[in-house]
Amino acid sequence: MNQNPVEEGQKFPLTIRRMGINGEGIGYFKKAVVFVPGAITGEEVVVEAVKVRDRFTEAKLNKIRKKSPNRVTAPCPVYEACGGCQLQHVAYSAQLELKRDIVIQSIEKHTKIDPTKLKIRPTIGMEDPWRYRNKSQFQTRMVGSGQVETGLFGANSHQLVPIEDCIVQQPVTIKVTNFVRDLLEKYGVPIYDEKAGSGIVRTIVVRTGVKTGETQLVFITNSKKLPKKREMLAEIEAALPEVTSIMQNVNQAKSSLIFGDETFLLAGKESIEEKLMELEFDLSARAFFQLNPFQTERLYQEVEKALVLTGSETLVDAYCGVGTIGQAFAGKVKEVRGMDIIPESIEDAKRNAEKNGIENVYYEVGKAEDVLPKWVKEGFRPDAVIVDPPRSGCDQGLIKSLLDVEAKQLVYVSCNPSTLARDLALLAKKYRIRYMQPVDMFPQTAHVETVVLLQLKDK
């Protein structure tokens, strides 16, 4: 029996009590929870129910009767359609407060820990919260008689929203994407059709090194064949000297994953170089690197503040990517060991260590939950561990290993408060949370990064 008093299509007034983990407004109508994208805490609004479930209603914003002082006009022309950003309509200072609250909500929802007893610090923001993303991944589609469009899929859909400019992207990523889009149209290169499974070019990926100016272009294709390749490469080389690496990645899977397993060089170098905390890093096409290089240094500074190091410690950098975090700490510890499931990332990490003259690091391809127990069996026990997992959080096998290993210091760098809270509830068996530091890596979105210092409990 449906306990929800709301019917689909119904319009009703609502007061927004708080904002949710996806940046939506939350209110209550006859005690039933209502989620309203685009609404802000404290606003009095009129909404229309678009999806009704037993326990909640999703509604669209029809009218604002009382506007929040934190409401601003979103500067992006496709903001509401695109879905890439969720908070452009919220003043930046209020975005930072919301992100701290999102961390609190996650603790409340996924653990039995009382967040009022935790030290959750104010969110560290950016001075200029725009044009920060160093990487773009724009989908392609063919419209009309041969016109090529590039953009992002709308929120919860596979409807492409054409994007001419994106104001959270580094300008060069947009410049390169638009140039390549026009080349694809000029030469009539077949564009991938998701429904039919036909066509060739699926996605245009561009990544830039903000400190070096080096830029990499990757054609994601449905086959090894890339028509008019020679002509396009010649035009790119002539018009875009900043593009120092051009790669092709083949992805024939019918999935939402951008990259396939096979990547090869078309022109220039295999990787681009970026600098971070006075270190140099080579980035290959599939390797993970933080998307906001400006805030990454702030993030790593917070990790550095969290750890107490004397120089005699052994440190594990789990989910190490190209080795950025571990190599930033290599000069402060006896040994760093890192692992990652992407072979190219480990190759990059080894090359980066050599480039930076760092000799006390060891890297291995594999899952953290498999590699760490293997190292322990071989006699290696870390004094400190840094985990920086993907949005899915730490594998449960790794959590078990961490509890078995009992490193005195554990720093968890999270990009998803929900999975962070889930993992903290498990780690609480042996660790206590010293503090949580939210960092805004993705202004204008509901995403929040959190640095958590955990300390082994006394036995």
From Swiss-Prot:
Protein's recorded name: Uncharacterized RNA methyltransferase lmo1703
Family: Belongs to the class I-like SAM-binding methyltransferase superfamily. RNA M5U methyltransferase family.
Organism domain of life: Bacteria
Active site: C415 (nucleophile)
Binding site for [4Fe-4S] cluster: C76, C82, C85, C166
Gene3D superfamilies in alphabetical order: 2.40.50.1070, Nucleic acid-binding proteins, Vaccinia Virus protein VP39
One protein family per Pfam: TRAM
The protein's Enzyme Commission number: 2.1.1.-
An individual GO BP term: rRNA base methylation
TRAM domain residues: 5-63
CDD domains documented for this protein: AdoMet_MTases
Residues annotated for S-adenosyl-L-methionine binding in this entry: Q290, Y319, D340, D388
